[in-house]
């Protein structure tokens, strides 16, 4: 791994894009539509105040849908996972990689302007490859 690569470098390819989030009060079906529309596999979840309160990812939603397809009608806040952790902009590639696990599909980072971005496995793969 490149020791020089920092968390802030990992968002380079999508730093110009607005972070896509699901709202706690949205239906799971609406969140799934967002994921399909933007070709993303994980979503941070925010409350009415804009605070990050949870997360969704395709693996957990897949398992929930297999158990009960009616889950689509539930609210996001009823099925969401814990929020993705934040990393410092200067966190190393190795640090970020260790934080992304089976249970934790992504991490969040705030740039110098205060904008929040998501770092996923795909971002790490792109940095290494």
Segments predicted by a language model, with ranges:
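Short hydrophobic beta-strand motif reused across regulatory alpha/beta modules
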Residues: 41, 54-61, 117-124
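Bateman (tandem CBS) regulatory domains
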Residues: 5-19, 74-83
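Residue-level signal for well-ordered, solvent-exposed loop/turn and beta-edge residues enriched
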Residues: 51, 114-115
């Amino acid at each position: 791994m490149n020791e020089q690569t920092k968390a802030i470098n990992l968002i380079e390819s999508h730093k110009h894009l607005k972070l896509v989030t699901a709202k706690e009060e949205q239906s799971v079906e609406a969140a799934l539509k967002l994921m399909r529309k933007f070709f993303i596999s994980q979503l941070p979840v925010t409350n009415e105040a804009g605070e990050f309160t949870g997360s969704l990812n395709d693996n957990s939603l897949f398992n929930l849908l297999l158990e009960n397809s009616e889950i689509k009608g539930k609210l996001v806040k009823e099925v969401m996972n814990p929020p993705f952790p934040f990393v410092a902009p200067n966190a190393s590639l190795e640090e970020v990689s260790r934080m992304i696990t089976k249970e934790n599909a992504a991490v969040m980072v705030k740039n110098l302007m205060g904008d929040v971005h998501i770092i996923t496995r795909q971002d790490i793969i792109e940095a290494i490859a």
